[in-house]
Amino acid sequence: MKLNNGQSGSITFIGTVSPAGGNLKEPVTESTKKAARCFYGLSQNRADKKRYPAVDPVDSYSKYLEYPEIIEYLDEKIEKGWVDKVTKTKYIIRKGKDAYEQINILGDDGVPMSYHEQYWKSELVDFVILQQDAFDEIDGSTPLERQKLMLD
């Protein structure tokens, strides 16, 4: 957006809700998610495991990654196919979560080795790419160029 002084700026819309009992399906939460078109789901489980930020990577999403103009911008700014890489990474994490649940139910020997591979691959993505130390000078924020190198 163009500011009155001639500089460019942006507007960020943030909608927050804290539903009683954590019910994310109640009407106010659903309306807020629909208006914001993105969702950061905080996870008590991740916080308990000291995995910060405690944003659940499976439940969280951004509908903006579906907009052609955003895809085009990211293709130009980072690299062609960036949204596909992000989608693939989220898929790895989702499959790892599913595999972890099966391993917990059936035990280590009750699942094929591929489940363990999926789980440990998702753990690697979680530890290396998703988790951050906000107090660390380097790890406090991740520039796009570093994100690109990490996903390559």
Task: Identify the function of each model-found stretch.
Residues M1-D152:
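P-loop NTPase catalytic core
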